[in-house]
Amino acid sequence: MVKKSRARNTRQGTNRYFIIGFSTIIIILALLMTAACVSKTNDQTKEPIWSIDGSNILSFRHRDLEAPQTILIEDTANYSLEKISYDSYGTTVYGLLRIPKNVSKPPVVVVLPAATVSKEEDSPMADALSSWGYASLTLDERGNGGETKGISPMDFTTGFEGYRRGDMPAQYAQIYDILVGYDYLQSRKDLDGGNISVLGESMGGRFAVIAAGMEPGFKAAFVVSSSPYGLDAGNNTDAIRFVDSVEPATYLKKIPPRKLVMFHFTNDTIIPIAYGRSLYDNASQPKAWYQYNGSVHGVYSDIYAPDLHAELMSVFGR
């Protein structure tokens, strides 16, 4: 379905200066192939927490919610806002938990912002979710300019080197952070732990697909302005396994019978709509595709809000 833009989102250019476009893939591939020459120095005395199966799908042997802390930073007539943190594989993850008032045990949406967008900058999405009666946990991703420190999951060269050593690549650590965030929400008695979905914008959309594929407790995956990475690992076996394990398309088959819902704008210059559609076309039912005229990329917009709200109501049942 195509919908005309009713208004231009004033934040649509927030992350324009970041792009993992197909024009940069040749550079990334060159770095991956260079890294493939690094000797394998896996420390056999320390078993990795992660493993890759025969389909190159990532899994973790266990997940540990460590040192969770909560600070109330805002309390209004309509919602409360808490800053939460927890330790997660070498760093401390920070997030903002917004809980609507006058809603008993609300469903929750885990929000994963686009590249260069912090949890605070993504507040329009949290505002909308709260107005619809949903809580939201918006995470600062690793190395994305927010409070959560660490190597960026966009650094594929360092990630591949870590993979070959048997360390935790940043790409895996980012997914681990999200899944531990899910576990944190499960521990909250004031939230509906049986009604949690994940929503990602641009870069965060890729993480959302992977996280939903790995954690069956997520009720659905919502993806705004995202696509496959489209990396080609050549003929190197290790590179193929690593690239497949971080590629969202690998995890599409793990999402059904839960729903994948995607939103994209026709004139998106950061991730062209054809790239987003390729991810959608590779997914199985149930799924839904919404496209709109305009160039909004990777942020909340009133343009797609009614469709997002309707899909959330369908998933959560309220």
Regions found by a protein language model. Give the residues of each.
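The feature captures the conserved acid-bearing segment of alpha/beta-hydrolase catalytic domains
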Residues: 232-283
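Secretory targeting signatures
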Residues: 1-40
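Primarily recognizes the serine-hydrolase "nucleophile elbow" in alpha/beta-hydrolase
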Residues: 176-241
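Cap/lid segment of the alpha/beta-hydrolase catalytic domain
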Residues: 120-175, 233-234, 239
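Short beta-strand element of the alpha/beta-hydrolase
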Residues: 97, 105-114
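C-terminal catalytic histidine-bearing segment of alpha/beta-hydrolase fold enzymes
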Residues: 278-318
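N-terminal cap/lid segment of alpha/beta-hydrolase-fold proteins
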Residues: 61-103
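Alpha/beta-hydrolase
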Residues: 112, 139-141, 224, 292
